[in-house]
Amino acid sequence: MLILAVLIGAGMALVEPVKGLIRQKYSNDAIAVAESAIIQGEGTITFEVPASPALAIPGEEGEEDTGLDKLIRDMKELSGEHESLTLLGILEIPCIDVKEPIWDTCSANALRYGVGRYPGTSNIGEPGLCNLFGHRQIGNLDAKLGSIQYLQEHIGEEVIVTTTDGTMHIYKIVKTVYVKDADLMPYLDPKTYDEETLCITACGWGKDPVTGKTYPMNTEFIVICQPASED
């Protein structure tokens, strides 16, 4: 019985890393498809990703069930239904080694495989505020924006967004802020800024790795970027 318990425990410990690798594979495949579209200037394209709840990010749906039944169900569901998502381009933040596909939605499923444009905010490259959301889940190997809080040490660094029509948009980081969910609305309104502004948003709760300050649940970390000058 002890050996069986050890084997079960070891198997369960491997589940999240395996799921992370699967999610990352689809993210990488989406980047490859976007890069091909960029070269050819294809414009907006679609890409299929798994829609199975088996690939949910830890904490996405509340407390995780870690029982053996859950493990077996998850493994059976991995080949289930897929969803077609609109792929807008690629987000790159060189100073923290981020390169992720950008989806035209912030659905839970889309954010498992990249970052998403918040519905109703400006389109990339247009006047007003465009907000890209992503996960900063603690302890996940495939956290899309796992190092985002370090950008408070990189004011002035470049953020690059290349859309699938082949257009490269280069921004500079101008500011980072922590915002409570209750105060988030200005960062979801395209009219908050008249000029073109890119925000990148992820959860901000927990201990800040730079300042050491601890932030409560329902807090977001936002990076505010504006177009780099051409001179």
Predicted features by range, described:
Residues 2-231:
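Solvent-exposed, non-transmembrane regions of membrane-associated and secreted proteins
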